[in-house]
UniProtKB/Swiss-Prot annotation:
PANTHER family the record matches: LARGE RIBOSOMAL SUBUNIT PROTEIN UL30M, MITOCHONDRIAL RIBOSOMAL PROTEIN L30
Protein source organism: Brevibacillus brevis (strain 47 / JCM 6285 / NBRC 100599)
Protein name: Large ribosomal subunit protein uL30
Any one annotated GO CC term: cytosolic large ribosomal subunit
GO molecular function: structural constituent of ribosome
GO biological process, one term: translation
């Protein structure tokens, strides 16, 4: 199964609380921090919500 490599590229300053909570739930804290998550609809939805703040790459498991 494929995985998603998610990197925080933009600051959370001035963003809505909802967007901040979504980034925190993805496990991202600082700019350029990266996490690898399973590719599933829940994670895709979270990424879509903050797509302007993150960079996503698909990686093989």
């Amino acid at each position: 199964m494929a995985k998603l490599q998610i990197t925080l590229k933009r600051s959370l300053i001035g963003r809505t609380v909802d967007q901040q909570d979504t980034v925190k739930a993805l496990g991202l804290r600082k700019i350029n921090s990266t996490v690898v998550k399973e590719d599933n609809p829940a994670i895709r939805g979270m990424v879509f919500k903050v797509k302007h703040l993150v960079e996503v790459k698909e990686v093989e498991a």
